[in-house]
Amino acid sequence: MQGQKSHSFKLFLWKNIFVVGASFCAVFFGLGFNSNEASALFVPTLSASVDQTNLQVNGNQVINSTDKTTEIPFNFTVNTNNRTGYTATLSSETENTALTNTGSLTGAKIDSISANLTLNNLPNNTWGYKFGASTNYAPIPALSTPVQIVQTTGKTNGNESNQLSIGMKLADNLESGNYINKLVISVISNPYERRAVMMTGKDFNRKVDSIVTSLSNDDGWGNKESVSHIRRSSASFSDIPAGAIDVENDEVSDYPIKIWYDATNKTIFYWAEANKIILNRDSRYMFRGFTKIEDIDISDFNSSEVEDMAYFFYKMKSLQSLDLSSFDTDNVTDMTGVFAYANSLKKLDLSNFNTSKVTNMSAMFHSMADLDELNISSVNTRKVTNMSGMFYGVSKLASLNLSNFDTGNVTDMGRMFSGMNSIQQLDLSHFNTGNVTAMNDMFSLMTSLTQINFGANFDTSNVTDMTGMFYQSTSLVNLDLSHFNTRKVKSMNSMFSQMSGLTILDISNFETPSLEDAGSMFAIDPGFSDNLEKIYVNQDFDTSKLTTSTNVFIRRNRLRGGNGSYLSDPSTADKTWLRVDRPGAQGYFTRKS
C-alpha cells in the first residue's frame, strides 16, 4: 500500500443553511517485486491523488434552487509506468451507502439512488455518482460490491486525470443535521508478468558480429563462419563471462538478455533470467549469415509477438535440422526469405505454422537445394500478395502439394517455381490468379516438368510480364495455354526459349495489343535440341507497340510457317514474321482454324 487519505462527507444544518461536505479515502496499491532479482531492469511504480479531499455543499442553496439539485465534480489523478496499466474502483467505506445524519434521533439520511438516473430525475433526498461524460448518475456501491470506474491497458503518459461527479437532490422535509459518509477510490496496478524481450533481429545480428571471429563480408553483413552452435546457457548471473553483451530491448524488457561467444566450442550462448525470451516484433535478419551453424536451440524463444520474420534463418547453409514445433507465427505478416539459402536442410515441417496474417512469402524457400521433404499442408495463404521466388531453386523436391493454397490476393508469382528441376507434375488446378500481374520466369528451369494442370481459374487477364515464363523447361512436350488471356502482357521475352521438348506450340488464343518485348521469345541455344516445328495461332501478332524483337526465332531451324515459309538463318527474322504464313506474307505461324 503506497498511501491512504481519509476525510468525511457531511451534511450540516445550521440556521437553515445546509452544507454537504464530501471526503474520500483513496487507497493505492503498487506492483511488488523481488528485490533479490538483482538483474531485473524494470521496477513498476504507481501513485494517485484526488484534487478535493473534502467536498462541501451548501444545502440551503440546493433546496432553494429551482430544481433542488447539485452536481459536485472532482478529479483523481494516476501516474504509473506499469505496462499493463491500472484499475480504479469506487465504493463506500462500509456497507452503508447513505449519507447519515449522525445527530438524528429518527435515523435521518440521504439514501443512494437505486438505479441509473439523470440528475433531474433523482428522487428527493438521494445521491449518486457519475464518471466522466456520462449523463446518468449511478448508485453508490457498497464496500462488498465496488464498481470499476477505470481500467487501462498501458502506462500513463505522465499524470492521467479522471473526473467523477457527485450528484444529489434535496427536499424541504430534510431533517436538520450533519450528514456523513466516506467513499473509497482504490487504484490497483493491473497484473503484470515481467518479460525478457529481445532487441530487433537486425540489431541482434550486428551484436553477434561484434563478438565473433572469422567474419566475411556479404553486402555489408557479416557471415559468422566461426559459429557452429547457438545454445542457451544455464549459468547463474554471477557466472556470466565479463565479455557478455546485452541484447534485450531496453525500452520494454524487464530483464537483461546476454550473449557471449565461446571460441573453443564455436558457440554463441544466450542467457536470460526469464524462462522464455520474447522475440521482437521486428525479428527480420535475426540469424542471417550464420553460414556454418550446425544446430540452434530456439525452444525457449517465444515468437508470438513477431510480425516481421523476413530472412530469419537466411543463409544458414550448414544447418541440418530445424525444430519449429514451438514457433508461434500467429502475428507474422512478412516471411520473405525466411528459410532462403538454408540449403542443407533436408526436411522442413511447417504443420504448426499459422500464416493467416502473412502477406509476403516471396523467396520463402529460395535455394533450399537439399530439401526433399516439405510439409506446408497447414499453410494459410489467403492474405498473401507476393509469392515471387517462393520455391526458387528448391531443386531436390520431387513433389509439391498446393491444394490448400488460396492465391486470390496474390499479385506477383514471378520465379515462383523456377529451378525446381525435380518436379515432374505440377497441379495448379486450385489456383486463382485473377489479380496476378507478374508471371515472369514462373516455370523457368523446371527441367523435369512434364505436365502442368492450370485449371479454369488460372486467369492471366491482368498479367503484364511473362518474361521467361517457361524458359528452359526442357521436358514439357505438351503445353495447354487455352485459358491464357494475354491482352495486357507487355513482355514475352524468352517466354518459350530453350523449350527443347516441344514439337508443336498452340498459342491460338494469344492476343498481343500491349506487347512491347518479344526478344528471344522462341529461341533455342546451342546444346539444346531443336524440335519445334509448328506454332499455331488464330491471328497475326499485334506488333503495333513492339519495340524489341531480336532473335525471336534464333536457331529454330525446323520451324515452318503454315505455308512452308522459313529462313535459312532464323535469327534474321524481324517482327513481320510474327504472323500467319500465307501467300504474299511470310511468317512463322500456322493458322489453327
Residue spans for each PLM region:
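Intrinsically disordered, low-complexity segments enriched in small/polar residues
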Residues: M1, V19, F28-G30, V57, ...
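Sec-dependent, cleavable N-terminal signal peptides
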Residues: M1-L41
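Intrinsic structural disorder/low-complexity segments
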Residues: K5-K10, Q151-G154, D427, S475, ...
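Signature of Gram-negative chaperone-usher
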Residues: S39-R194
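Negatively charged
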Residues: Y192-S593
